[in-house]
Amino acid sequence: MENKSRYKTIDHVICVEENRKIHVWETLPKENSPKRKNTLIIASGFARRMDHFAGLAEYLSQNGFHVIRYDSLHHVGLSSGTIDEFTMSIGKQSLLAVVDWLNTRKINNLGMLASSLSARIAYASLSEINVSFLITAVGVVNLRYTLERALGFDYLSLPIDELPDNLDFEGHKLGAEVFARDCFDSGWEDLTSTINSMMHLDIPFIAFTANNDDWVKQDEVITLLSSIRSHQCKIYSLLGSSHDLGENLVVLRNFYQSVTKAAIAMDNGCLDIDVDIIEPSFEHLTIAAVNERRMKIEIENQVISLS
C-alpha cells in the first residue's frame, strides 16, 4: 500500500503476519542524475528511525540511486510493535520482508547499507537474500561485547531468570529476557557466530569502522573480513568518529560522503572509493530533514485518529 502525500519521499506500508505493518520510505533518483544499476536499501542502526537517514538518502539520490529505507517491527519509528519486544530475529524478519516486497515489485538488483546493530542482522540474512554488494558502517560483529560496552555490564553472562525486566539502551527500554533468549537460541551473541554467517560470502563487501568507536573493536572487524574466503572485501576507517556517526556535522558529512562514494564504486564493481560525488547543499539537506520529520508526524497522527 502506498500513501500519497505532498512530500518527495514516498511512504509505503507492507502488511505482514498478525496484521502487523512495516513502513517503507522510497526516495527516487534525482532527475538528470547518473544512472545506477542497483537500488540501495538502508537498514538503520538500533534506536534510529528512517528520518534519521534523510541526509544520506539525499546524497545517494543526488548521485543517481533509488533509495529504500524502513523501520523494523518492534522498534522505534512507524512500524508495528514496541521496542520492549524487539529481538535480533525480529529485525531479520523485517529486513527479509522488505526485500521480498521489493522483489514482488520487480526490484531485484539491490545493494545494502547497514549500520551498527543492523549490520549484524544483515550478516545473518545474506544467505537468504540476493544482493549485489554490502556496505556496513560501525557494524556490530560481536554483539555481546557491544552490549556490554553500551550497557555497562555483560548481561548476557547472567542466567535468564536473573536478568532485569528491561535494559536501558540509549534511553530505550529493551525487554531483557526476550532479547537474551533470542540471542542464545538463534546464535547472535558472539564474533564466532558472525564469522560463521559470513565466511562463505561471495559478494563485494566494504566495512567502515570508526577510529574512536568504543563499541566495536576494529581488530574484530579485521578478523571477520580475513575469514571471508572470497576476499572481495575492504575496510575503511572514518577518522575522528565514534560509534555515533551523527555526533557532529563534520563526522556526519564524512559519513555521507564516504558511504556515497562506496555505493558508487560498488555499483561499478569496484572496492576503491576514490570517486567523485555530487554533494547536496546544506540548505537542501535541512529542507529534506524537516520535511521528513513533518511527514513522520503526519503519519503518526493518522494512526492515532484511526485508533
Curated annotation (Swiss-Prot):
Residues in coiled coil: none
Entry keyword set: Acyltransferase, Luminescence, Transferase
Query: Which pathway?
Result: Lipid metabolism; fatty acid reduction for biolumincescence
Q: Ribonucleoprotein among the record's keywords?
A: no
Q: Which domain of life is it from?
A: Bacteria
Q: What residues make up the catalytic site?
A: S116, D213, H243
Q: Please provide the Gene Ontology terms (biological process) for this protein.
A: bioluminescence; fatty acid metabolic process
**UniProt GO molecular function:** acyltransferase activity, transferring groups other than amino-acyl groups
- Under Enzyme Commission nomenclature, its number is 2.3.1.-
Pfam families listed in its UniProt record = Acyl_transf_2
The entry assigns this protein to a family as follows: Belongs to the LuxD family.
Primary role = Acyl transferase is part of the fatty acid reductase system required for aldehyde biosynthesis; it produces fatty acids for the luminescent reaction.
Q: What is this protein called?
A: Acyl transferase
User: Origin organism of this chain?
Assistant: Photorhabdus luminescens
**What is the gene called?**
luxD
